[in-house]
Structure formats: C-alpha cells, structure tokens
C-alpha cells in the first residue's frame, strides 16, 4: 500500500521544535526559520508538509498564523506541488475557515471533534478532502486540549463516530511514543486501520523499518515523521523512495 509521508514542522513561539510525549517543557529547538525547513523537506521530494501550531493547541486558538502563511507562500512560489496540512487550535468553523484561507490544503480539527457537531459541519461546509480530525490517544483513550486532559472516550470509538458523520481522514497520534524514537504503536494502528478511514499515523517513527511496517497495515494511508528526520535517524529521500513516492520538482 502506498504511504504518504508528512515531514513535521511543529511551531512554538515561531520556532521549529520537537516535543517528547507532548510535554511543552521538553521542547527541543531545531530551527528559527520554518520556511527554510519546509523548503528542505520539499527539496527532498515531500508531497506534503505537516504543520502544527503548538501554542494554538494549548491556548485553543491559532497563534502562529504569520509563520504558516510564510511557509505556504514560499512553497507556492518555489515548490508548487507541495501541500500543507495544519493542526493546532482549530476548534471552531471560524478557525478552520481562517486556516484554509492561509492557503493550507487541509485543516485538522482537534478537541472540537469531541464536542457538538463541529466535525460534521466542517465536512459539510469545506468537504472531506479539506478537513481531517486529530485523534490523540494515551493508552487507547482520547486526550484533549493540547493533550492535557485524558477522556474516557476510546480512540477507535471516536474514529467510528467521525466516519459516520462524513469524515474521511484522521490523524492518529499515540502520545506515549510521540517524539520518543521508540517505534509506532502498531497494534493501535491496526485497530484504527479497520475503521474504514484513511489513517495518518503519528508518533514514534525511528527507522526505515518502522515506515516499511506501516506500509503493510491496511487503512494506514500516511505517516507523520518528525524527530527521526531532525536527528538524522531517517533520511527523507530514502523514506520517500521506500514508500514509492516521487514528485516532479
């Protein structure tokens, strides 16, 4: 199965950082120029860039719009085939609309998927290709509001609910493995893959072997890769080749 790879750019105070298990107090800064880093991944052949507004995720509203706009505009000029998906603090239709107005191709709904009918309304308004739902889990249960609160909702159950209201794509993050370079939670991903959704896996990728195993899980359509790229544990061009991805530059 083809797997789309999403190099990650996590923004905190305008800088590119990586966290460990979502803890803001364990942020490692990998750069102060997100545009340059996005260009680096695009030049390696990426089709997508995954951008997260960490400040927005914590505060409940977007905080790094200027940096996101700069990334989108630079890619449009130099690498027009590369698309951006954005998450973090997008909990209302208004926030989603503002994110899409920045030029991103897909906006990711966070905590709001648990509350009311935001996901259903977003799909109806923007279409299933323009929105996705982020399902972040600890021990199989959904974590909300910047991963601060762990609910009693099972991740798989939320995924099924999202499918029933028209959502097509979910980003599944296993918090325990996020930023740890210990390998993804393959067992949870196999369960998520059986929901009928296109699942984008996030958390724990540490090697090309991890990526190869993800290509074998039905329903897993993509993978977000962060710390492994920034530490050099994985070469993006090699990973893209393994996944059968090529892009004309």
From Swiss-Prot:
- Is the keyword Cytoplasm assigned to this protein? yes
An example GO CC term for this entry is: cytoplasm
Q: What are the alphabetically sorted keywords of the record?
A: Amino-acid biosynthesis, Cytoplasm, Histidine biosynthesis, Isomerase
Its name, as the record gives it, is 1-(5-phosphoribosyl)-5-[(5-phosphoribosylamino)methylideneamino] imidazole-4-carboxamide isomerase
Q: Which reactions fall under this protein's catalytic activity?
A: 1-(5-phospho-beta-D-ribosyl)-5-[(5-phospho-beta-D-ribosylamino)methylideneamino]imidazole-4-carboxamide = 5-[(5-phospho-1-deoxy-D-ribulos-1-ylimino)methylamino]-1-(5-phospho-beta-D-ribosyl)imidazole-4-carboxamide
**Which domain of life, per UniProt?**
Bacteria
Please give the biological process terms from Gene Ontology that the record holds.
L-histidine biosynthetic process; L-tryptophan biosynthetic process
Which Pfam families does the record cross-reference, listed alphabetically?
Answer: His_biosynth
Q: Which family does it belong to?
A: Belongs to the HisA/HisF family.
Tell me which residues this entry annotates as catalytic: 10 (proton acceptor), 136 (proton donor)
Q: What is its EC number?
A: 5.3.1.16
Chain's gene name: hisA
Spell out the subcellular localization from the entry.
Cytoplasm
Please list every transmembrane segment annotated in the UniProt record, as residue ranges: none
Q: Name one GO molecular function term.
A: 1-(5-phosphoribosyl)-5-[(5-phosphoribosylamino)methylideneamino]imidazole-4-carboxamide isomerase activity
Instruction: Write out the pathway annotation from the protein's UniProt entry.
Output: Amino-acid biosynthesis; L-histidine biosynthesis; L-histidine from 5-phospho-alpha-D-ribose 1-diphosphate: step 4/9
